[in-house]
Amino acid sequence: LLSVCIIFAHDMITRCYLEITNVCNLNCLFCPKTTREKHTMTLDEFDTLTTRLAGEVRFLYFHLMGEPFLHPLLPEFIVMARRKGFTPIITTNGTLLAQRGDLLDALPHKLQISLHSHEGNGKDNPEQYIDEVMSFAKEAAQRGCIVVLRLWNEGGLNRMNDSILDMIADRQPRPWTQRYDGWKLTENLYVESDDMFEWPDLQH
């Protein structure tokens, strides 16, 4: 019921996308959605799959179609993944960060927060959303987690990008260090811009 997507590089597996849930709390316009039966991975399922992948995959991504922060066992999954030698990476829409302070004690190697999901749901006034995102992101970055605030909406719904960047600057003042894909705000904390993501055919 859930998906596993494996990425090869030079005949080696480098990345694996492990869908720990296909349930999401948003309805983003840019997301193709899934018609599969809703399912949330159990601890035994995660243990079995990661045992099979151990030693074969370096980067383990805990998402595909669902929102990983909805999973109550996410901290346990991260700890288990690290113990088995994976580098865990999570992408989230960021709406549940304020409710998941438990994740601050079980952070992944990298946390990618899709800020474009806010406007992608037709929402206005992102002040509270950005406040909650930045509060979690700054604390996570201070604890050694790489945090990437993503605005992957060039060519799509992006009229709020400038105001979102200004709100971020209110909480992490400029100047920022310019990068090829955005800015480095401070140690371990980045803003990344890109074109609107085009989903591959996942046979959903």
Name each model feature, range by range.
Residues 2-111, 121-128:
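Conserved alpha-helical substructure of the radical SAM core
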Residues 3, 7-8, 41, 61, ...:
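Radical SAM enzyme [4Fe-4S]-AdoMet core and its adjacent flexible, acidic
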